Amino acid sequence: MAEVKDHFAGRIAENYDQSSAWMFAPEVVEPTVDFLAELAGDGAALELAIGTGRVALPLRQRGVRVAGIDLSTDMVAQLRKKPGAEDIEVTIGDSASAAVAGTFTLAYLVWNGIMNLTSQDAQVACFQNVARHLQPGGCFVVVVNMPDLQRLPRGEKFRPFHIGSTHLGFDEYDVANQGLVSHHYRLRDEGWKASSMPFRYVWPAELDLMAQLAGMRPRERWSDWTREPFTSESEKLVGVWEKRT
């Protein structure tokens, strides 16, 4: 399996909370934490790609014991600056292979984190790694955007996802290989700076099969944290898989 690259180092980590401020809003975070706390129950939770603690810190404040995995030492350094971070143990590594002490009633990977693993093998390995950490009956939650292929004109591979005065974003699709590269152009003091991040998009049925290979079964499938039904028009999947007993 290919080495996973840290795409969140340096300035990206330093500016992450500010550039993603809308994701930290109470109306976004609270339904997320409600959903996860319910599944965790009296047990502990493991967050894959814990980042700067957007979800882990408020979940810990709810009384859920939380551990985390993240590849980016710089993102974890930002987490460590925040109140309550001392209660969260973080292992540096990728979601497909990093090992954490103990077992958990809940593991979760939100905000397209599964897509940061850019091969099918790595995504399958992620499910298998989670299964090793879950107690029997424990749940794995994956949140991922649905591929926006319906809006991609035939023969085209680029689609803009954000046009602003200081940021331009374009997705580049490789439909044959389920590949996606997000290209960012950000206006800095020294001028426009370009960066790109690769992803591998996934479909719900494919995730179900990955879970099956890891000894899990589907439990819930929603379009958001408030348990709205998942349909063909849904832009996001909130999937829950349960480790077989």
Predicted region positions:
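A short acidic, Gly/Pro-enriched loop at the edge of an enzyme's catalytic core
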Residues: 99-106
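Conserved class I S-adenosyl-L-methionine
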Residues: 1-51
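C-terminal lobe and adjacent flexible extensions of AdoMet/dcAdoMet transferase-like proteins
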Residues: 206-245
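A conserved beta-strand element that flanks and buttresses the S-adenosyl-L-methionine
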Residues: 108-110
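A short glycine-rich, Lys/Arg-flanked "PGG" loop and its adjoining helix->strand segment in the class I
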Residues: 124-136
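SAM-dependent methyltransferase
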Residues: 141-210
